[in-house]
Amino acid sequence: MFKEKKAPLVCKFGGTSVGTSSSIQRVCEIIRKEKPSFVVVSAVAGVTDLLEEFCRAPVGQKSQFTAMIREKHESIAKELGIDVAIEPFLGPLKQFEGAGHLQQEDQAKILAIGEDLSASLICSYCRANSLQLEQLEARQVILTDSQFLRAEPDLALMQTMWGELVLKENTIYLMQGFLGATASGATTVLGRGGSDFSASLVGELCEARELRIYTDVRGVHTADPKILKDTQLIDFLTFEEMQELASSGSKVLHQDMLKPCIRAKVPIFVTSTFDLTKEGTWICASLNEGVEGPEIKALSLKANQALWFVEYHSPLMRLENVLRCVRGLGSIPGVVMAQNSGVYFTVDWEENNQSMTEALREFGAVSCEGPVSLVALVGAKLTSWSMTGVFDALQGTPVLYWSQTDTVINLIINEESGVVVTKLLHDYVLGLNRSGL
């Protein structure tokens, strides 16, 4: 492993940033100008969805998804004027076109194809335009356990292997996001949105000076600009604030990707691939000296949630055991609200939740309500925030449950009220900010 005189810059480009030939050209321009040490890329926009459809499709219908994936990449390559061998990457698809049920290990091989293809396209185009990149194979860097579809990185093993890599100075390395491998070499994936996680792990390994996330928005906004029109760009967020937003519905960053950056103290800058203003949001351990944000900085909305409550049958029950049980069933707890008598938590709603109910009965009486929406107000020093104004802003909209910590106020409401409540609270927060309260 080399040590640069200047700490490395890691750049990550999401699916929308590599979704068309013109966007790939833009990515090449950014790489040429910024000269990052490491570039991590997602699959072409929409391709992971097609690969998931392939895995679910019955025998006889899988081949249509193979054809769509082939056509999408061949079309981009043609528009870019490059010659890329697409067919070798499609081998696992052809292999399983006649298969019914796919094992998780086989699904991981299939889902990884998207990033393998996009990395090949981008590397070929950059080289064709006199920008020399070296490909860094993710399966040799992101080493994981054998939970094939939501693998956990083995950080100790990764650090050992990273130290043994022979990397050249003054070289740009391009790596696939989202995927990794077990110690024995079997392909694994990190779960949807896992390319962010891959990039943050690389940032931790190389002790990066900055992790720059390029996406289709300029940064983190006061609410999702795809839901509300009058959102504002946030200049700075702490890691803790971004963690709350990510766990409660914000789609800007993957929930797990913050942990490596927190451990290694790597600041994150979120910006747009397509906006030439270079505006964005800094996410770091603490706000820059002299910068004071509003008490409530942002809102997030997470729809189609289930609100579970486990009322402990013994005071010896432990929260971590409940959450371990939930994760063992393949669900990811979003908001967790602990009480002395039990715990409330949210996960994605499923009509058939019998297996979750039966598993949780080990800890106490179980109830579930859903589907519901979760609206979170994220900021700083919120334990002292008066809830009167929040409830007044809701204009009588029923709240099923709410909780308040130093960094987040969580509201559980009826599913159909999610967007309306987000708009009402966003107007309330912006009004306070404008008045300086």
UniProtKB/Swiss-Prot annotation:
InterPro entries: AceGlu_kinase-like_sf, Asp/Glu/Uridylate_kinase, Asp_kinase, AsparK_Bifunc_asparK/hSer_DH, Aspartate_kinase_CS. NCBIfam families: asp_kinases (TIGR00657), PRK05925.1 (NF004579). Belongs to the aspartokinase family. Pfam families: AA_kinase (PF00696). The gene is lysC. One of its GO terms (cellular component) is cytosol. It catalyses: L-aspartate + ATP = 4-phospho-L-aspartate + ADP. Keywords: Amino-acid biosynthesis, ATP-binding, Diaminopimelate biosynthesis, Kinase, Lysine biosynthesis, Nucleotide-binding, Transferase. Pathway: Amino-acid biosynthesis; L-lysine biosynthesis via DAP pathway; (S)-tetrahydrodipicolinate from L-aspartate: step 1/4; Amino-acid biosynthesis; L-methionine biosynthesis via de novo pathway; L-homoserine from L-aspartate: step 1/3; Amino-acid biosynthesis; L-threonine biosynthesis; L-threonine from L-aspartate: step 1/5. Its EC number is 2.7.2.4. This is Aspartokinase. Transmembrane segments: none annotated. GO terms for biological process: diaminopimelate biosynthetic process; homoserine biosynthetic process; lysine biosynthetic process via diaminopimelate; threonine biosynthetic process. GO terms for molecular function: aspartate kinase activity; ATP binding. It comes from Chlamydia muridarum (strain MoPn / Nigg). PROSITE patterns: ASPARTOKINASE. It comes from the Bacteria.
